[in-house]
Amino acid sequence: MGKMQYYTVKDYVELLEKRGMLLENRVEGEEDHVIRNLTYNSKEAGADTMFICKGAAFKMTYLREAVERGAVCYISEKTFDLEQQVPCILVKDIREAMSVLANFFYNRPWENLVVTGIGGTKGKSTSAYYMKAVVDDYMEALGKKESAVISSIDIYDGKSLVESHITTPEAVELQQHLRNALDCGI
């Protein structure tokens, strides 16, 4: 389990290069900067952030806001012409890269959790909550914490209970919730 480890921009570049995802590395001068936040939401950007430019509806104003809030670099499928030069990492497929980056950033939390996935067209949330109830009763009998759940209804990760807004969380949120569950001893 252990405390979360943070990595440098160079570590992320090397990871993407090793996976064959890197198109271009334009992070001169920021290679040793430690990344402590990974997000695609400009409102969540702050100091030491690697900002992910993703989606068909992505606007350059999001990147500008992230940089104003402290993002040290961005990752994208293309470069953006900003007023100031911002280090960037260019990748072939931003969605694939985002999942690899999130897994790395959150230190692969799933490796230390028991994870069950439920698929199908009907009854996934119902099945998940039945399963959670059974597991929680068992855990309570052992004097242990209740289980986490990620569903289309809500998400409980030991740290917070929030309403779910989409059926499947993005890779960054998914790994964050798994990390929270791990850190909370679930």
Give each language-model segment a name.
Residues M1-V100:
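N-terminal leader/targeting and accessory segments in enzymes
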Residues A97-I186:
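Phosphate-binding loop of NTP-binding sites
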